[in-house]
Amino acid sequence: MNFLRYLGPGLLVTVGFIDPGNWASNIAAGSGYGYELLWMVTLSTIMLIFLQHNAAHLGIVTGKCLSEAASLYLPAWLKNTILATAMMAAVATAMAEILGGAVALQMLFGIPIKLGSMIILVLVLICEFTSAYKRIEKLIIVFVSLIGFSFLFEVWIADIDWAQAAVGWVKPSFPEHSMPVILSVLGAVVMPHNLFLHSEIIQSRQWNLEDDEMIARQLKYEFKDTLFSMIIGWAINSAMILMAAATFFQPQNAKQVDDLATAGKMLTPLLGNAASVVFAAALLLAGISSSITAGMAGGTIFSGIFNKPYEIKSKETRWGILLTMIPAAAVILLIDSPFQGLLYSQMFLGMQLPITVFTQIYLTSSKKVMGKYANSLRLKIALFAIAVIVTLLNIALLFVQ
């Protein structure tokens, strides 16, 4: 029962793991290659568990988020460079999330993309500025649950080949021309803003930093929360690929579906109108919830620049949210092709991710920062290997898009 009371921070992070960018990548994977790329969801989830647990570890042991720790322990010029790029990454993330919500509004109500983006922006800002963290946490848990049930419904009415799926989850496969999709699945899972966010929101669970027994207990509960939440994310991402594979994939004439609106429309003649409506409604929930957490991440990063925690009543946090969400919506509003802007935003995330990951590993490996809770040699090696793999794959993604 203690664990159930602790559950929450990991699910907020999971929202970034099932955001509209993941939807597009997963549907492209399932429609183009059937069940063959399910293994990439498994691999990326395992890597994500290591990285997110490590970020939360920092927050529990130090009482500081990744942004605050960088401000405290790195030279000013380096800290400013890292956190400035992290803020830009938060903007790029928010743009993708807002756009996903706008696509859902268009699918459900015929609202134009640019107007829909402004509606999502207003909804998200109202939610963030009028809600305490605990209320947002409960809201996100409800949204994640509804998204999960939505895909249970989609999988239930689709004709899944479970034998092929079981093989796909564990057997690496590299079908011809699949590398861009493989890379996009990974790139949509490990995201910079989530590392900052997790290290901050884990501190919503109060503890005594002077009590080693309390810290050990918090670390145990945090890992269970992270593991449980990432498994939920793995299941939802897998369900997206399963649904796309069962519905859209044609072995003799494979045609990749990489547009969310098109995917929603194609579901109607194949699975019925209810499937299309549920798909769009779940996308709307994903867009709103991931936009909220992207704004929170921006508030966390910006507050940390001034060595302050995320606190919605503080001007630093509010400015951080506004500096994340308004530019993201403005880009959608001002450019001719929002989806072209989305492509460039994802490319920037791929370039920024190594900066955040290696900064985190440096800080959590430092005895000056973490004391006796610094990363062990084996954990350093594992984290460094994951960081190198993620970095190389994200760099490769820049050249194959």
For the regions a protein language model found, what residue spans apply to each?
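Extracellular/periplasmic helix-exit of transmembrane alpha-helices
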Residues: 47-61, 202-206, 211, 231-262
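Loop-to-transmembrane helix boundary motifs in multi-pass membrane proteins
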Residues: 76-77, 114-117, 228, 288, ...
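Membrane-interface "cap" regions at the ends of multi-pass membrane proteins
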Residues: 1-21, 76-77, 181, 217-221
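Hydrophobic alpha-helical segments and their helix-loop junctions in multi-pass secondary transporters
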Residues: 144-171, 186-202, 359-368, 393-401
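Juxtamembrane transmembrane-helix boundary signature
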Residues: 13, 40-72, 81-89
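A generic transmembrane alpha-helix motif of multi-pass inner-membrane proteins
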Residues: 164, 174-180, 356-362, 371, ...
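Helix-loop-helix module between adjacent transmembrane segments
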Residues: 47-55, 77-97, 102-132, 187-188, ...
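Flexible loop linkers connecting adjacent transmembrane helices
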Residues: 25-30, 53-78, 103, 251-268, ...
